[in-house]
A protein has these predicted regions:
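Polybasic/polar functional segments that serve as interface/processing modules
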Residues: 1-116
C-alpha cells in the first residue's frame, strides 16, 4: 500500500476581503459571472455552478472545477466576502483570485495558501 500521508494533493487558497461596497456583495448575477470567468480565464475546467441569493441579502456561489472548486460567500451587511480556491492540478489559485479581487475593488484583504 502506498503511503499518501505526505503526498501533495493540491493548493488551497483562502481569501477574506473587507470594506467592499454592499451593492457588489449582493449582486448575484455579477458574482457568478466573475467567479466563472476568473476560472475560465486561467484555464480551469468549469463543470458546474451553483448560486444562492439569501434573503434579505448575501450570496453564495460555488464553482465545481475539473481541478477542484471555487466557493464565494458574501456578507453585505458587514461589507466582507470570503472565498477559497482549491486546485489539484498545475494551475495557481492565486492567478484566479486576482480576477475575483479585481471585481471587489479593495486592497483590504488577507490571502493564505496551504499545501494539501
Amino acid at each position: 500500500m502506498k503511503n499518501v500521508k505526505n503526498a501533495h494533493m493540491g493548493t488551497h487558497l483562502l481569501v477574506e476581503v473587507y470594506n467592499v461596497p454592499f451593492e457588489k456583495l449582493n449582486d448575484r448575477d455579477k458574482i457568478e459571472k466573475v467567479c466563472v470567468s476568473a476560472c475560465k480565464t486561467e484555464g480551469l475546467e468549469v463543470l458546474n455552478t451553483y448560486i444562492h441569493q439569501f434573503d434579505p441579502y448575501g450570496v453564495t456561489c460555488t464553482v465545481t472545477l475539473g481541478e477542484s472548486h471555487l466557493s464565494c460567500h458574501t456578507w453585505p451587511e458587514k461589507n466582507c466576502v470570503a472565498f477559497d480556491i482549491f486546485t489539484c492540478g498545475t494551475k495557481n489559485p492565486r492567478s484566479v483570485a486576482w480576477w475575483v479581487l479585481e471585481y471587489f475593488d479593495t486592497d483590504d484583504y488577507v490571502m493564505k495558501d496551504y499545501a494539501r
